[in-house]
């Protein structure tokens, strides 16, 4: 069901004024997707957690760490035949269907993961993850600025066209929201995710459950928009659907059917039409669409053929033979004219310099912090209350030798208060990883530029919080009231806070789950608290433990203040 030249020229004329607006300087290069004998493997096995498993995971933590370090444990994999073979030309849309949605997700992730150049293929998951404090227009503008150099007029036109294309003009100034903050609906969020994926400029787009949360009319409009963009820019799109009408079904050029980890069909969708009266398939309901008959084909009766039999039958079919011929021809052409491995298909595109990306990310991070004014105000109030509490508890300490021990306890309490307030970064980093993973995969941001901008914004915001805390503590407790001493006290606390923030973020990035991140951060904090020099002085520590003093920010800050 290939698209003819007349429809392509019509789509191109429809989008001719988008060439410099919709994807300026990021026109995707037509890419052929070909794979033979591909075997998708599961990422991991996630058992159902129980109370007993939580206790055992805590006790057996050293053994599990040793297993990961020395690779003693082998993953349990279901034996599967590497029967996945497909040849997709530029400008084609592929429908991925399976009785189990997880099989479609695994197949799409395998396509995106095995590419030579990052950003050439992107995966849009079924879960729509966006910054909840931004509006729809703000998100699109930041995504446009992150990809390439644009003039202000072109940026405005691109935003208007995107909003009009996906029919989300009415929510341009509405917060995206999340489970707590009220925002846009699920269908509007899904259309925003599709628009964001198009802005990535990737050559191959993989959509998991493309029409999730959309009604029939909106789903048809969304698929037709993607069809027009594919015809205009010769993209390659893989999409899985939970339900599809006959019009949506006819929009796709190829079909991949999966059952129990085997490819049971690969070819044009029109080949499924004669299967309505197949006695070996589960009968579809009356007036069912072709997509329903497809599911009836891959969900057979208990007495019908197995997945192995269906895969073997597909390998003996004419569609598999045509795919094998196309793959052999394509591989022969690739071997005849190999491209240099260092030549990226995006070397000609005009990109932002690193400092411009940092500036753009600085603006966005400042806007994110300012939008979340409630959390910002609460954190300032907590620092004020904490500083006043410590200051009033140690009000007007004696400046003689009698107050030396109390003064040491005061400084140690200040160090602990600053360190405890930075523990919240573990939860923020762990829960925010899906969004970061998405923007890094789309190449909207680079990790180095993102963390540089994040540290700069944190320094500006956290300096005000630490300043409020330092004023309350320093002047209520009658410490040495000179400008150099106060500035030194403030600088040590600020450096301590930033060190703990970065340490907790590193723990959140290294741990796989939220539970393991919290336990690791708590263990590290308690260890640093005990060996900081107040509870257990450095002189009384065993020789094998003294070297941790140089890795302990609490110990370094406490010794600097003393």
Show which residues each predicted segment covers.
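Membrane-spanning alpha-helical segments of multipass transporters and channels
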Residues: 264-266, 274, 278-286, 296, ...
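Conserved catalytic motifs of ABC-family nucleotide-binding domains
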Residues: 102-103, 128-138, 150
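Helix N-cap at the start of a conserved alpha-helix in ABC-type nucleotide-binding domains
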Residues: 209, 216-217
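Hydrophobic anchor residue at the start of the ABC signature
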Residues: 194-195, 222
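Walker B catalytic motif
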Residues: 180, 207-211
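Conserved catalytic loops of ABC-family nucleotide-binding domains
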Residues: 201, 217, 221, 225-244
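Topological signature of polytopic alpha-helical transporters
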Residues: 1-92, 97-99, 117, 124-126, ...
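A short, proline-enriched helix->beta-strand linker immediately N-terminal to the Walker B motif
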Residues: 197-204
């Amino acid at each position: 069901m290939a698209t003819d030249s007349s429809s392509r020229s019509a789509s191109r004329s429809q989008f001719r004024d988008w060439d410099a607006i919709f994807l300026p300087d990021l026109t995707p290069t037509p890419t052929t997707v070909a794979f033979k004998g591909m075997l998708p493997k599961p990422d991991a096995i996630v058992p159902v957690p129980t109370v007993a498993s939580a206790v055992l995971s805590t006790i057996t933590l050293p053994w599990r760490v040793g297993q990961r370090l020395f690779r003693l444990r082998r993953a349990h994999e279901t034996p599967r035949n590497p029967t996945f073979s497909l040849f997709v030309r530029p400008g084609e849309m592929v429908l991925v269907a399976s009785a189990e949605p997880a099989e479609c997700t695994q197949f799409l992730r395998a396509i995106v993961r095995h590419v030579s150049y990052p950003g050439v293929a992107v995966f849009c998951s079924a879960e729509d993850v966006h910054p909840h404090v931004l509006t729809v227009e703000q998100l699109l503008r930041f995504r446009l600025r992150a990809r390439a150099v644009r003039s202000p007029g072109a940026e405005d036109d691109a935003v208007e066209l995107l909003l009009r294309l996906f029919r989300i003009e009415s929510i341009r100034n509405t917060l995206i929201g999340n489970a707590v903050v009220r925002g846009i609906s699920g269908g509007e969020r899904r259309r925003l995710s599709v628009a964001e994926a198009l802005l990535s400029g990737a050559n191959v787009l993989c959509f998991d459950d493309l029409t999730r949360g959309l009604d029939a009319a909106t789903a048809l409009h969304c698929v037709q928009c993607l069809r027009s963009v594919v015809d205009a820019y010769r993209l390659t799109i893989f999409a899985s659907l939970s339900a599809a009408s006959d019009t949506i079904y006819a929009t796709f050029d190829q079909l991949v059917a999966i059952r129990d980890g085997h490819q049971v069909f690969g070819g044009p969708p029109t080949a499924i039409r004669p299967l309505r009266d197949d006695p070996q398939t589960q009968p579809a309901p009356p007036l069912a669409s072709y997509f329903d008959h497809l599911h009836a084909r891959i969900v057979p009766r208990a007495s019908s053929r197995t997945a192995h039999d269906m895969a073997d039958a597909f390998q003996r079919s004419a569609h598999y033979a045509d795919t094998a011929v196309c793959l052999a021809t394509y591989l022969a052409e690739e071997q005849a004219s190999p491209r240099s491995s260092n030549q990226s298909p995006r070397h000609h595109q005009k990109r932002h310099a690193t400092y411009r990306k940092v500036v753009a990310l600085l603006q966005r991070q400042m806007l994110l912090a300012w939008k979340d004014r409630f959390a910002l105000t609460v954190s300032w109030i907590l620092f004020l209350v904490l500083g006043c509490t410590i200051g009033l508890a140690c009000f007007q300490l004696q400046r003689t030798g009698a107050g030396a021990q109390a003064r040491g306890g005061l400084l140690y309490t200040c160090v602990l208060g600053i360190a405890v307030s930075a523990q919240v970064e573990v939860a923020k980093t762990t829960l925010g990883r899906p969004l970061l993973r998405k923007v890094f995969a789309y190449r909207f941001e680079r990790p180095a530029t993102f963390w540089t901008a994040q540290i700069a914004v944190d320094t500006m915001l956290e300096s005000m919080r630490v300043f409020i805390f330092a004023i309350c503590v320093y002047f209520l407790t009658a410490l040495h009231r000179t400008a150099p001493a106060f500035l030194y006290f403030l600088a040590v606390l600020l450096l301590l806070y930033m060190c703990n923030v970065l340490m907790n973020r590193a723990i959140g990035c290294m741990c796989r789950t939220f539970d393991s991140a919290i336990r690791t951060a708590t263990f590290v904090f308690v260890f640093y608290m005990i060996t900081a020099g107040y509870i257990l002085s450095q002189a009384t520590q065993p020789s094998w433990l003294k070297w941790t003093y140089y890795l302990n920010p609490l110990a370094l800050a406490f010794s600097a203040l003393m």
